Amino acid sequence: MFDFDATLPLMALQFVLLAIILNAIFYKPLNKALDERADYIRQNETGGQQQLAEAKELAAKYEQQLAQARKESQDIVAQAQAEAKQLATEAVAEAQKEAIAKKEAAAQEIEQQRQEALKTLEQQVDTLSRQILEKLLGPELVK
């Protein structure tokens, strides 16, 4: 099957030479390209992780600012509602004061007119009483 003659060392030498040439021409550049690709992937992964961390940090800041803005807007709305309620209360109180003042003024005017009407009625009663007495008794007796 195998002949152990001078061709065997020559074949072994060719195999070693082929391995050295392939190593220099093919395997070293291939390993170098694979290593560079692995470094590139590692760098991109590290950069991606950093960008993801920055994005998460920015998202957290945004959420915090959004929460603060919501709280401030709720405070402003609550303050505006309180001011509106106070203004409404003051307006109602002022309207009640005006209504009471008008009611009192109307009551005083009614009382004044009542007093005037009573005076007028008293005068008319006196006049009518005198006229009746004059008719009954005569004008000479009534004074």
UniProtKB/Swiss-Prot annotation:
A GO term from the CC aspect: plasma membrane-derived thylakoid membrane
Transmembrane segments: 6-26
UniProt keyword Transmembrane helix, yes or no: yes
Main location: membrane
Cell compartments where the protein resides: Cellular thylakoid membrane
InterPro entries: ATP_synth_b, ATP_synth_B-like_membr_sf, ATP_synth_b/b'su_bac/chlpt, ATP_synthase_B_chain
Membrane topology: Single-pass membrane protein
Gene Ontology MF terms in the entry: proton-transporting ATP synthase activity, rotational mechanism; proton-transporting ATPase activity, rotational mechanism
Top-rank taxon: Bacteria
SUPFAM superfamilies hit by this protein: F1F0 ATP synthase subunit B, membrane domain
Keyword line: ATP synthesis, CF(0), Hydrogen ion transport, Ion transport, Membrane, Thylakoid, Transmembrane, Transmembrane helix, Transport
UniProt cross-references to NCBIfam families, sorted A to Z: PRK07353.1
PANTHER family reported in the protein's UniProt record: ATP SYNTHASE SUBUNIT B', CHLOROPLASTIC (PTHR33445:SF2)
HAMAP family recorded: ATP_synth_b_bprime, ATP_synth_bprime
UniProt record similarity statement: Belongs to the ATPase B chain family.
The protein's role, per its UniProt record: F(1)F(0) ATP synthase produces ATP from ADP in the presence of a proton or sodium gradient. F-type ATPases consist of two structural domains, F(1) containing the extramembraneous catalytic core and F(0) containing the membrane proton channel, linked together by a central stalk and a peripheral stalk. During catalysis, ATP synthesis in the catalytic domain of F(1) is coupled via a rotary mechanism of the central stalk subunits to proton translocation.
Record's subunit section: F-type ATPases have 2 components, F(1) - the catalytic core - and F(0) - the membrane proton channel. F(1) has five subunits: alpha(3), beta(3), gamma(1), delta(1), epsilon(1). F(0) has four main subunits: a(1), b(1), b'(1) and c(10-14). The alpha and beta chains form an alternating ring which encloses part of the gamma chain. F(1) is attached to F(0) by a central stalk formed by the gamma and epsilon chains, while a peripheral stalk is formed by the delta, b and b' chains.
Protein name: ATP synthase subunit b'
Organism: Crocosphaera subtropica (strain ATCC 51142 / BH68)
